Amino acid sequence: MWSLGIETVFVTARPPRWIDPLAEHVGGHGVVICANGAFVYEVAARRVVEAVGLARPSLTAIVADVREAYPGVGFAAERPEGMHLDPGYRSPMLPPHAHDDPSIERGPIESVRGVVGKLLARDPATPDVAFVEGVAAIVAERGIVAYSGAGGLAEIGPPGVTKATALARWCLERGIDAADVWAFGDMPNDEPMLAWAGRSFAMDSGHEEVKALADEVCAGNDDDGVAQVLERIR
């Protein structure tokens, strides 16, 4: 794509700490939009260059309200400096021995330091959809609750911050119109971005809501669906 003068940018729910393996694929501009739009990560320098976080009073209130509704909930936070783990947070997606990893800050979620771009909440006792919908109702206008396919995980970001808003800002800085953007997605957290882009593609392996929204459904991830679409413009 670079040789054709087409910019490509990764926009992901993943935190910066999961991005480094993608370094060779990121492209000349060298950045990835992470954490559902909360962070812009410069891969070569291994640093977050832009960060938007939850206001501390909102974070504290959200934690208290969600905990009251779901007593078994555990929390974690994604920050520019890395992850913060509350003692009660359990997830099959945590790396092995995460609770013993010295690079991860640990303690009650109320003690988290720095910018919290994404607050993670998980209650193993509550069905996935019911939990995410319940948390969204509790959070209301204080933040945006996203679901990226991780079992039972509610991802709470700052109000007004989505993949779409971050990508729109990135494009504006480069003089790229929404009409000229092709976006690919597979999960509900992609929906605002797909609605914003001039042309949207849902992966066939993706969520049914996303496939209903997109302009076109392409082959799934295992069948190189993105590559198949991009071959059209060579």
What name fits each language-model region?
Residues 42-44, 211-217, 227-231:
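Short, charged, surface-exposed secondary-structure boundary motifs
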Residues 2-92:
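Active-site phosphate-binding/coordination module
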Residues 26-28, 35-36, 44, 139-142, ...:
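Short, structured coil segments at secondary-structure junctions
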Residues 69-184, 188-196:
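Conserved acidic, metal-coordinating active-site core of Asp-based
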Residues 19-23, 131, 135, 194, ...:
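Hydrophobic packing residues within well-ordered alpha-helices of enzyme cores
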Residues 12, 167, 177-214, 219-221:
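Acidic, Mg2+-coordinating phosphoryl-transfer loop and its flanking beta/alpha structural elements
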Residues 1, 12, 36, 119, ...:
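Residue-level signal for inorganic ion chemistry
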